[in-house]
């Protein structure tokens, strides 16, 4: 051997006697190994090639006659790794070259000499401990193949030991490789050799420790059991997991453990088990960050789900399966015509190709010419391929991984520009979210945070996200309802975002109309002067207030007199005075009319030193305002340059932020109202206002002048007008929130139910934020009535009304004076009603009936209305106030049962809270739905669903909105309010029933569909109409006439 080695050494530029590494004397071998380490550190990475190192090591490992040669070959690897030459050795040992010694080292695990076997395992461990972690993917296929197929148990056991070392040395990379690891280890646990079985079990336990998902941490032992003993453990584990709420991101280690369980579970026979699997698959898939995470399991999981949806009998379980299929297709980007089993293989980057790219880029950036076969450069190509194939395009990772190996080939060259350009190229090719835009480095940074996390309670909102904000930019923060937009802004203002600059460095202001009810009587000027955060003099404050529309007179008005639009302008005035570096605006156009929205756009676009982060569902406002879009999706925050239109070019599926398209799988459904006594067409008026005028107590200006109008079931009314024109006041008078105080009358049908959502929609739930929507509904409707109705002005008795009622409570009956106690019941009386009245101190047998007009004349109008409301709800066939029915009702508004029954309303997003308010307002099946600014906080998808639901609603609709797109898509009638006067157009007001279609007679084909126990519709046989006696006589006469003519005719009795 020595002559061959010497010849190899002398033929190259380097010189080293390799034979000394394989002599019998161990001390001499060790000395030679140290000498080689010194020599290679001086001469560089190509020294190994020059002396023929790989060929000599492979030859020595295969020398069955010389134990010292085999042992020496293993020892020199360990010596080089332990003495500072590991990085120089890596490109030669870990490569795709045919003469790499790695396979021979693995075969040495089965050497008959124990010392050689021990040295071989130690050598491979030394390589694994010192190598770059991204090289793990190069070694792993060989290890897994030997564990699965080797006929020698020693090699299997040794490979499992190395696998354990890999898990320790490169945990992140091994976590990514879990889809490949788990099946091999689960099989190896059943090996016939106890040593292999024991090693496999230990390795599997170590591998599952890589699962960091807090949702399933406690279930990991059960999941491992189900892998090892599927027949008995799978049903139990599925039951355990089905009760789990997934809130943490689902990564490769997590899905590697759960997917085999789901695949096996779908092969079980019980429908309940299959349904639970579908629920788990759906919930889990929603939290998968990338298609590549779920891709390995699609060929087995998706076809089984499709088969389940086609064969399962229970319709509800079928719908759950279909939901899981839709989610899995979306996450895995599987075409509609594919079942996931025929997906094309993912593109694979090759090390030599990337090494060629490096050669060209080095030359482009002024480097010297270098051969792509250079070990350092070729190995950098291998590592770059490993990064690309595992979709890691993080700049820091590339800059820390590749330059050290490029430096081996080009010691004096700065390789960072070449690495960055290749990273950008590969990221663009992969269409990854990590791709950077050309303007990324332009402008002054206000904040540059990398790898931060954000959670709300147990729910993960952002995971390893980056956020970079430039001075003077206007960022539109986009994402679905519930994705965490408002939570992120609250976290910024409350200093809860790790790495965000403190207030002493960057002044941040949250624009919101946060006016406390206790401050309603304070003047506008005093309220602003009282804000100690504002760095402004009283004169500056006054001039700023004037600049946004608050003249001297208006500054003296109380805050409580401001409409929603003026409150938002006041909040913006405070933001101007705060002199902020960053403005946070959450739905700033809420309650603003068109003119004020234009003013806001002009103001924001004029700011050159102030940065804005804007959350808004007004697509036109965003399109005209923002310079960049921050997209909050899949736990990441990605910046896209340009406005909303440009953003849609980059992310086509985000069109839902820009267009009002109703999604098939996301629709709202409003409950249709019951019939009303005496109402035979949709044109008949149910609510009338005649010559009503109104002025708020304490206000110097009258709000409404001589208003007359009416509302019917066919009404589709848009109430339009500038801020402060009296729109909300008008609606409050119609719904009974307030009462006319300057003359006029408001009349409504005694059984009419109105569903009302106020301008500040959240005021309905403000006192119940720590309750779940379920608990709120149980409280609000606990008596069968709407408890919110009890606080309306038309239900609260004034002192004058109490005095009048007390005076009119005396009834003379049979010469005896009686005092009215309560109104007990009601019944029809011609065109009106009469009411059963009980008397104080008398039994129910003494009750009498009094007409409505008489009771109203006696001052009992509000008591009459109270009884009318109870009767209206009873006639509305109120559904049972139970959990299942409430969950089903909210489901019609896109709110999952999970949020209804298990999440407090404080933790819900703005959009989800609006859905709660909408659901609560429509629980009583209202005849008229009145919505004051309903588009606030709803995303475009929810807005489209609401529009479609209102179009299909069988009752009347009143809408106050500044969103023209919303109003024009629903309303045919316009009530234009201008300085307290009403101009109505497009209406169809009639006296009496009108000429519309009759609604009081049920059509013959309107019978309700009945369902069997599984929910499938029952097709009923039509009942034959029974003949009357006259019909029978007529039929008999007809038969006799036909017989007389010679025809052969028989009756049923004769047959």
From Swiss-Prot:
Transmembrane found in the keyword field: no
Gene3D superfamilies according to UniProt: 2.40.50.990, Leucine-rich Repeat Variant (1.25.10.10), P-loop containing nucleotide triphosphate hydrolases (3.40.50.300)
Ranges: HEAT repeats: 48-86, 96-133, 134-172, 176-213, 218-255, 257-290, 296-337
Catalytic activity: ATP + H2O = ADP + phosphate + H(+)
Biological processes per GO annotation: protein localization to plasma membrane
Record keywords, A-Z: ATP-binding, Cytoplasm, Elongation factor, Hydrolase, Nucleotide-binding, Protein biosynthesis, Repeat, RNA-binding
Region called Disordered, residue ranges: 1024-1055
SUPFAM superfamilies named in the record: ARM repeat, P-loop containing nucleoside triphosphate hydrolases
Top-level taxon: Eukaryota
Domain spans labelled ABC transporter: 447-659, 687-1004
Signal peptide: none
Gene knockout outcome: Knockdown leads to sensitivity to the endoplasmic reticulum-stress inducer tunicamycin and mislocalization of CCH1 to the cell membrane.
One matching Pfam family: ABC_tran
Enzyme class: hydrolase
Subcellular location: Cytoplasm, Cytosol
EC identifiers of the protein: 3.6.4.-
Protein name: Elongation factor 3
Taxonomic placement: Eukaryota, Fungi, Dikarya, Basidiomycota, Agaricomycotina
Annotated gene: TEF3
């Amino acid at each position: 051997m020595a002559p061959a080695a010497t010849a190899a050494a002398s033929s190259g530029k380097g010189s080293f006697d390799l034979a000394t590494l394989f002599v019998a004397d161990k001390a001499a071998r060790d000395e030679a190994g140290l000498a080689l380490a010194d020599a290679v550190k001086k001469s560089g990475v190509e020294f190994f090639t020059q002396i023929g190192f790989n060929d000599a090591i492979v030859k020595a490992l295969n020398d069955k006659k010389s134990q010292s040669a085999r042992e020496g070959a293993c020892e020199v690897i360990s010596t080089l790794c332990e003495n500072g030459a590991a990085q120089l050795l890596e490109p030669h040992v870990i490569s795709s070259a045919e003469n790499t010694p790695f396979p021979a080292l693995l075969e040495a695990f089965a050497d008959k000499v124990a010392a050689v076997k021990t040295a071989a395992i130690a050598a491979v461990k030394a390589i694994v401990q010192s190598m770059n972690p991204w090289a793990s993917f190069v070694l792993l296929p060989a290890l897994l193949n030997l564990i699965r197929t080797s006929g020698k148990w020693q090699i299997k056991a040794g490979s499992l030991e190395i696998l354990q070392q890999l898990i320790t040395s490169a945990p992140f990379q091994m976590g990514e490789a879990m889809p490949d690891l788990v099946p091999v280890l689960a099989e190896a646990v059943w090996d016939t050799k106890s040593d292999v079985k024991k090693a496999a079990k230990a390795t599997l336990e170590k591998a599952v420790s890589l699962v960091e998902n807090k949702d399933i941490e406690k279930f990991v032992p059960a999941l491992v059991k189900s892998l090892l003993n599927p027949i008995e453990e799978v049903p139990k584990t599925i039951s355990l997991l089905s009760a789990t709420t997934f809130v943490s991101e689902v990564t490769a280690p997590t899905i590697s453990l759960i997917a085999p369980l789901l695949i096996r579970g779908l092969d079980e026979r019980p429908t309940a088990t299959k349904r639970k699997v579908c629920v788990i698959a759906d919930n889990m898939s929603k939290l998968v960050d990338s298609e590549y995470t779920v891709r390995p399991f699609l060929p087995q999981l998706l076809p089984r789900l499709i088969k389940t949806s086609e064969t399962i009998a229970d319709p509800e379980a079928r719908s759950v399966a279909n939901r899981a299929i839709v989610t899995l297709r979306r996450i895995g980007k599987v075409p509609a015509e594919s079942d996931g089993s025929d997906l094309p293989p993912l593109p694979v980057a090759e090390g030599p190709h990337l090494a060629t790219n490096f050669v060209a880029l080095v030359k482009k950036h002024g480097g010297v010419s270098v051969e792509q076969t250079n070990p350092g450069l070729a190995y950098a190509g291998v590592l770059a391929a490993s990064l690309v194939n595992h979709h890691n395009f993080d700049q820091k990772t590339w800059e820390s991984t590749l330059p050290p190996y490029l430096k081996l080939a080009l010691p004096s060259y700065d390789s960072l520009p070449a690495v960055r350009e290749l990273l950008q190229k590969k990221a663009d090719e992969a269409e990854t979210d990590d791709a950077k835009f050309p303007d990324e480095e332009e402008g002054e940074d206000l904040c540059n945070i990398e790898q931060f996390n954000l959670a709300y309670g147990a729910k993960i909102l952002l995971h390893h996200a980056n956020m970079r904000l430039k001075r003077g930019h206007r960022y539109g923060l986009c994402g679905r309802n519930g994705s965490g937009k408002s939570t992120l802004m609250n976290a910024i203002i409350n200093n809860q975002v790790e790495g965000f600059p403190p207030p002493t460095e960057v002044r941040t202001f949250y624009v919101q109309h946060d006016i406390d009810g206790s401050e309603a009587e304070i003047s506008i000027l005093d309220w602003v002067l009282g804000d100690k955060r504002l760095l402004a003099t009283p004169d500056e404050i006054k001039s700023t207030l004037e600049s946004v529309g608050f003249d001297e007179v208006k500054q003296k008005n109380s805050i409580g007199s401001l409409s929603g639009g003026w409150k938002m302008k006041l909040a913006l005035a405070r933001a101007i005075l705060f002199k902020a570096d960053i403005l946070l605006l959450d739905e700033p156009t809420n309650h603003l009319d068109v003119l004020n929205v234009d003013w806001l756009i002009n103001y924001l676009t004029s700011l050159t030193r102030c940065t804005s982060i804007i959350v808004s569902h007004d697509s036109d406002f965003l399109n005209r305002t923002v310079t960049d879009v921050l997209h909050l999706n899949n736990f990441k925050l990605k910046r896209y340059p340009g406005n909303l239109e440009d953003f849609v070019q980059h992310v086509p599926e985000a069109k839902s932020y820009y267009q009002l398209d109703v999604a098939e799988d996301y629709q709202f459904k409003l409950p249709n109202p019951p019939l009303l006594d005496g109402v035979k067409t949709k044109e008949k008026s149910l609510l009338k206002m005649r010559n009503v005028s109104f002025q708020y107590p304490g206000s110097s200006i009258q709000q409404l002048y001589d208003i007359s109008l009416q509302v019917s079931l066919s009404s589709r009314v848009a109430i339009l007008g500038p801020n402060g024109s009296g729109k909300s006041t008008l609606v409050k008078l119609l719904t009974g929130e307030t009462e006319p105080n300057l003359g006029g009358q408001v009349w409504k049908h005694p059984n009419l139910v109105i569903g009302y959502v106020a301008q500040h929609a959240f005021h309905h739930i403000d006192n119940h934020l720590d309750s779940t929507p379920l608990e709120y509904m149980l409280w609000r409707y606990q008596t069968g009535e709407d408890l919110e109705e009890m606080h309306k002005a038309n239900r609260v008795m004034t002192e004058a009304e109490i005095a009048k009622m007390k005076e009119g409570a005396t009834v003379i009956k049979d010469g005896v004076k009686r005092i009215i106690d309560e109104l007990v019941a009601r019944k029809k009386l011609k065109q009106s009603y009469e009411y059963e009245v009980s008397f104080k101190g008398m039994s129910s047998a003494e009750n009498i009936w009094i007409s409505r007009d008489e009771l109203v004349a006696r001052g009992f109008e509000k008591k009459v209305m109270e009884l009318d409301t109870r009767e209206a709800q009873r006639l509305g066939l109120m559904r049972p106030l139970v959990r299942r029915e409430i969950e089903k009702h909210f489901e019609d508004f896109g709110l999952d049962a999970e949020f209804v029954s298990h999440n407090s309303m404080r933790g819900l997003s703005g959009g989800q809270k609006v859905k709660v308010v909408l659901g609560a307002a429509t629980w009583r099946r209202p005849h008229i739905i009145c919505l004051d600014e309903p588009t606030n906080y709803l995303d475009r998808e929810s807005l489209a669903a609401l529009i479609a639901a209102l179009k299909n609603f069988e009752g009347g609709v009143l809408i106050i909105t500044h969103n023209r797109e919303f109003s024009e898509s629903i309303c045919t009638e316009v009530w234009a309010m201008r300085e307290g006067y009403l101009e109505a157009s497009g209406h169809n007001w009639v006296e009496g029933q009108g000429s519309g279609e009759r609604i009081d007679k049920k059509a013959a084909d309107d019978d309700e569909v009945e369902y069997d126990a599984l929910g499938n519709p029952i097709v009923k046989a039509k009942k034959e109409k029974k003949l009357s006696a006259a019909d029978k006589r007529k039929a008999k006469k007809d038969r006799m006439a036909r017989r007389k003519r010679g025809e052969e005719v028989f009756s049923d009795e004769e047959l």
